[in-house]
Amino acid sequence: VNLYFHYQYVPEPLTPVKGVRKLDAAHLLTVDVENWRIEEKKYWRMEDAPPLDGEPGELIREKLEEVSELIVRSDVPVGVALSGGLDSSVVAAFAARRQNSLCAFSVGYAGRPDCDEREDAAALARHLKLPFHEIELDVRTIVDFFPQLNYWRDDPVADIAGFGYYAVMKLARERGVPVLLQGQGGDELFWGYPQLRDAARETHLKAALLDSPLSQALRQALTLRLPYYRSEQTVSSWARDLAGLRSGWRGVRRRRENPARMIFYDLSPDFAAAAARMRNFYGRNFVEQINERDASEIFTFPGGWSPVETTLTKLICDTYLRENGIAQGDRLGMASSVEMRLPLVDYKFVETVVGLRKRHSDSTLPPKFWLRQAVKDVLPEWVLNRPKRGFAPPTRRWHDALFAAYGESLRDGYLVESEVLNRESAARLAEGEFPPEATSPLSFKALVLEQWCRQMRRVIPAI
């Protein structure tokens, strides 16, 4: 649960239920029924991909061609979840060349705010000659569906974008399409997240500067930056950060901390808020039961963390992609009996990217440079060169509405009853505080966990 408040999900194979864990990814569990001997064996590791020589764009293109041929094989209709982003556009373009009956699905928001990408998705669908279906989410639907969504996720995941994932898959099923292709994995494999690129840069600096004079560290860190996205929230955060000077100073201090710790999730304002505040929010007995291990142990490597880029790729795939991305999407798809297929996380495709990364550094190249090179003759320029906006629904509007409807449940709810939260802090969280720099604030994480616990108690009364 402590990890949940840091990451917004419980990193696999751990679970929020004491004494219960999942079978880890890429593991085989065998049970000998003669003597009931149980054995777990890992059968694949990303980091074991052999180094690969060659031109990255060409080799990635070859693997995309192979994967796209396999991914559309089906005896039922196949669709694609399409946003305005590069990853889903790549999946749609390659699948459309091999599946004549492919159709596209997208989600938008009432009032068409700036974050609504339906027009971009529809434009690409027209370009690819794909039938296009859309669904619009309004605040009332979000509020009414909130408890059920948390139940269908199976695990607590404080991702407000989950409403959109579910809506698209439900729409596909209603249109008679039980298989949906998605672009998950592109951001994780090709440095699509600014925070991940920053982590690579800062980890390289940490390795170089651990034994360097402070003056040299300051010269490296205190540089001005432009905002990553053209959005009101991003530009506002950039201004509060004094164009990178504040975060640069924090980086100097971070690099001189635990030498075994990579720079990774600790760049997230949400992670930092949990590290600074959650122990004061927990009940006394709960604090005493928390394992003394730090939440950053996931990205701490006493034996060393080289090579940096490969290790970071594995970390983001083992954490955010696995639980917040793949697992959440799969469960919300199954809620509508829709099979989710993810060509960009095909293991041979992943091995190609990681193998190339062992020979060619790419974290300092423009975001998704290799992927853009691979598809430059497949997608139109207006898709390839579109600035990344970052997928986000109208978060604040939904957040405020959810707390107006359910916030009071935190004051004397399951989390207070079980002493996960102390009563005073639960009352503060019930107000729905949303700091300007937050993506998934502590208040929303608490609300999701409270509703998840209530749903679990409803179906399993003994909890």
Regions found by a protein language model. Name each.
Residues 1-52:
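N-terminal segments that mediate ammonia production and transfer
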Residues 3-10, 315-323, 441-457:
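Short, hydrophobic/amphipathic alpha-helical patches that form generic packing surfaces
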Residues 17-21, 158, 310, 437-438:
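Short Gly/Pro-enriched turn/cap motifs at secondary-structure boundaries
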Residues 21-23, 173, 313, 317, ...:
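A short catalytic or substrate-binding loop motif that flags glycine-/basic-rich loops and adjacent residues
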Residues 323-327, 400:
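Short, motif-level signal for alpha-helix interfacial/capping segments enriched in acidic residues
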Residues 379-436:
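PAPS-dependent sulfotransferase catalytic core
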